[in-house]
């Protein structure tokens, strides 16, 4: 068993980061996630948003793993459960693989909270528990997978910044469009007054 942990601070408010987290896939930084299906989404009586999603991924495999399972690429599935609590301003996301569970299990937990000293920033805490089963090289493979998770976490943070930039651009575009819509009738009204 291998445990991997990481912490990252986003220079964006919690609301922005959690919005981006829900729209993170697909993104060009991690093309291995090829599909996201929302299986269930509801708001409970206390106002928490619960989501259950299925992520479809496609991976190129290290040569040692290829020899074990006899494939160069493989499609895998991950189930993800998240809870967004707008009152406490926390988002907790838990994911686990549902493919190849007889060989490996990866249980990941991400928590997004406002930074204690600067509420305009958001702290992401990540942890993963990796267990390779029934293989004599399990500790080597667990280390290899931890390294892959670390690399993917970095790509995930880049993807979050990409989504946030995209969301901000969409908001600016909508605002500019709204300003233009308001000016056009006002300009027409002003022209009528001038006549």
From Swiss-Prot:
Residues the record lists as Phosphoserine modifications: 46, 51
Residue ranges of the TM segments: none
CC terms in the record's Gene Ontology section: mitochondrial intermembrane space; mitochondrion
Residues in PRELI/MSF1 domain copies: 1-172
ATP-binding among keywords: no
Keyword terms of this UniProt record: Phosphoprotein
Origin superkingdom: Eukaryota
Stated family: Belongs to the slowmo family.
Protein known as: PRELI domain containing protein 3B
Organism, as annotated: Mus musculus (Mouse)
Organismal lineage: Eukaryota, Metazoa, Chordata, Craniata, Vertebrata
């Amino acid at each position: 068993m291998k445990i991997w942990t990481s912490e990252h601070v986003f220079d964006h408010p919690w609301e922005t980061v959690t919005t981006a987290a829900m729209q993170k896939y697909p993104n060009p930084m991690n093309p291995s996630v090829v599909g996201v299906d929302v299986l269930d989404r509801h708001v409970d009586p206390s106002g928490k948003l619960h989501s259950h999603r299925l992520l479809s991924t496609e991976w190129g495999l290290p040569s040692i793993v290829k020899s074990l399972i006899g494939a160069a690429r493989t499609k895998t599935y991950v189930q993800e459960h998240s809870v967004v609590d707008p009152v406490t301003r926390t988002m907790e996301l838990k994911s686990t693989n549902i493919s190849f569970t007889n060989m490996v299990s990866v249980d990941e937990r991400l928590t997004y909270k406002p930074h204690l000293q600067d509420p305009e920033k958001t702290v992401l805490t990540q942890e993963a528990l990796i267990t390779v089963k029934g293989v004599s090289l399990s500790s080597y493979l667990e280390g290899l997978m931890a390294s892959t998770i670390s690399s993917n976490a970095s790509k995930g943070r880049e993807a979050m910044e990409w989504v946030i930039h995209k969301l901000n651009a969409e908001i600016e575009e909508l605002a500019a469009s709204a300003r233009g819509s308001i000016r056009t009738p006002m300009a027409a009204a002003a022209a009528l007054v001038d006549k």
